[in-house]
Amino acid sequence: EVHSRDKRIGTDVDMDTMAKATVGMAGADLANLVNEAALVAVRRGSKEIERIDFENARDRVVLGAQRESVIMTAEEKRATAYHEGGHALLATVLPNGDPLHKVTILPRGMALGVTWSLPQERHTYSKEYFEDTICKAMGGRVAEIVVFGHLNSGAANDLEQATSIARRMVREWGMSDRVGPQA
């Protein structure tokens, strides 16, 4: 709210939701986000910043610019939709992860699609939280196997994320029943 004081904000903007969607951003990042949202609103021809402007600005800042130059085949779009759907399904049904916020198959940054959860404000994380996060990360790969019977290269980042969390669970946090705590 500090960075939006001198801006005209639409009535559909919920600053609490925006705050949850920008956890971890520094003051300068938030100021940049508000300015980007104002630019999006101006391009839209609006005199006030609405929720959609904040969402588009946040997506651009956090996920990267939408890459309209990427031309996906119908099969690639279908595979991306099922892949992201796998992440979204698990984010919805697993009880210990962060809640699902947005799913898109519009290419952004280096990704062909994105499933985004809003992180809860926490200071510590449970073993169950990490297990659900790993499951969610692998959900896209599982969906590809179930629907298409094979994998493609689009899940590399998911595999990196899941592996990184699993390693840290064992090496740093002592969350392995088999290995046990170590120093």
Where are these regions (language model features)?
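Conserved P-loop NTPase/AAA+ ATPase motor core
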Residues: T22, A28-A183
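Alpha-helical structural elements of signaling/regulatory helical domains
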Residues: I9-G10, S46
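Conserved AAA+ ATPase "sensor/coupling" helix adjacent to the nucleotide-binding pocket
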Residues: E1-I9, M15-A21, E36-A41
